[in-house]
Amino acid sequence: MKRTYQPNRRKRKRTHGFLVRSRTPSGRRVLARRRAKGRWKIAV
């Protein structure tokens, strides 16, 4: 059986990257929430 996590750097960046997050209002909300929480990494 194929595992669910098939690592791919490009896909990772394009779906969860900083630029993608900052593009939409909800994504910016995600970044703001993670900044407020004090996350060491706010995006991939």
Swiss-Prot record:
GO terms for molecular function: structural constituent of ribosome. It comes from the Bacteria. Keywords: Ribonucleoprotein, Ribosomal protein. Gene3D superfamilies: 1.10.287.3980. The keyword Ribonucleoprotein applies. Residues 30-44 have a biased composition (Basic residues). Coiled coil: none annotated. GO terms for biological process: translation. Residues 21-44 are annotated as: Disordered. InterPro entries: Ribosomal_bL34, Ribosomal_bL34_CS. GO terms for cellular component: ribonucleoprotein complex; ribosome. Pfam families: Ribosomal_L34. Signal peptide: none annotated. Belongs to the bacterial ribosomal protein bL34 family. This is Large ribosomal subunit protein bL34.
